[in-house]
């Protein structure tokens, strides 16, 4: 199983600072009018890093802190960075929080998050700069908690209004600039063991249904050692976050990828909300990132009530592949600390 928590207090570090533990804070945002998307992750311990995996069970999160930032436009990646960082801090005080990982910062104050973006490092060809503010639109402050497991998923701000500015530079010259306005998402994950300890693989995604509602889903397919797990929520700017009851997730149109993983490109989500039947179809529109154990997608949603397409971000993660020495070798690029 997986430990699931819903609520704004999910930002606060919750794990015991012991070897082999990790925590990360994830943000994504989409500007529909400019076909821009960005994903931002702050890591206190990088459980996908081959260096981290080699150091288990004694991996120290302080030695493997860092960030991952990727910028996309029109379904294609413009730039992306994954760096371990030397200078890091995590400061909490009541409902405020500040994290710095190298040149990347995020500050929480009340229901808003301000993220400062600076990926520049010596000899870098490209760099992303800017500042984005995520305003959580859920004023209901609903809470929910269920399940047990090594991994904890904390759903914090699944429906945000996002505004700010971004720029992409090449060799210190600004190549492109944008004023960003769109919708966004934020969650946090933490754990006490390797990601493959509980499940082999999973599907996760968040997608707008309309201007007021977002669907969030997590699905662990059945494996030889683990039962299937399907969980979903609807985030409503008026009524808050509600769990999808009797949630059923069906994987369709499974295809073999270039990295020899079988991944569904259509996902049907069924269940009930307040006694009303729910049926939402998610399709993978563009593969934004792909590798030997991970795919990130730009996705579209469709319902009987809202047949037009709305966008979101999704991932497929094959944790079992992280056990492979071949896969670890493939992703073992030189570790730059910035």
Question: Where do the model's predicted regions map?
Answer:
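Structured soluble/peripheral alpha/beta segments that form catalytic or ligand/cofactor-binding pockets
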Residues: 1-338
């Amino acid at each position: 199983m997986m430990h699931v928590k819903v609520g704004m207090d999910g930002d606060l570090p919750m794990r015991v600072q012991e070897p082999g533990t990790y925590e990360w804070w994830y943000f994504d945002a989409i500007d529909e009018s400019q076909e821009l998307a960005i994903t931002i992750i702050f890591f206190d311990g990088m459980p996908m890093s081959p260096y981290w995996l080699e150091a288990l069970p004694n991996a120290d999160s302080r030695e493997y802190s860092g960030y991952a930032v990727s910028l996309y436009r029109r379904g294609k990646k413009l730039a992306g960075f994954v760096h371990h960082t030397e200078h890091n801090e995590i400061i909490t005080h009541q409902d405020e929080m500040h994290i710095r990982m190298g040149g990347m910062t995020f500050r929480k104050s009340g229901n808003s998050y301000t993220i400062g973006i600076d990926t520049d490092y010596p000899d870098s060809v490209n760099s992303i700069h800017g500042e984005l503010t995520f305003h959580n639109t859920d004023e209901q402050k609903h809470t929910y908690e269920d399940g047990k497991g090594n991994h904890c998923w904390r759903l914090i701000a699944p429906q945000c209004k996002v505004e700010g500015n971004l720029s992409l530079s090449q060799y210190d010259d600004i190549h492109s600039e944008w004023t960003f306005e769109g919708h966004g998402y934020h969650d946090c994950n933490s754990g006490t063991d390797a990601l493959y300890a509980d499940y082999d693989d999973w599907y996760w995604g968040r997608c707008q249904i309309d201007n007021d509602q977002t669907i969030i889903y997590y699905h662990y397919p059945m494996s030889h050692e683990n039962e299937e797990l399907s969980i979903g929520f609807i985030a409503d700017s008026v009524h808050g976050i509600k769990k999808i009851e009797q949630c059923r997730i069906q994987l369709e149109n499974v295809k073999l990828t270039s990295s020899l993983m079988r991944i569904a490109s259509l996902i049907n989500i069924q269940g009930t909300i307040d006694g009303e039947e729910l049926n939402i179809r998610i399709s993978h529109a563009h593969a934004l990132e792909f590798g030997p154990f991970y795919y990130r997608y730009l996705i579209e949603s469709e319902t009987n009530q809202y047949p037009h397409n709305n966008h979101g971000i999704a991932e497929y993660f094959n944790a079992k592949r992280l056990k492979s020495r071949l896969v670890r070798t493939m992703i073992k690029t030189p570790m730059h600390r910035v």
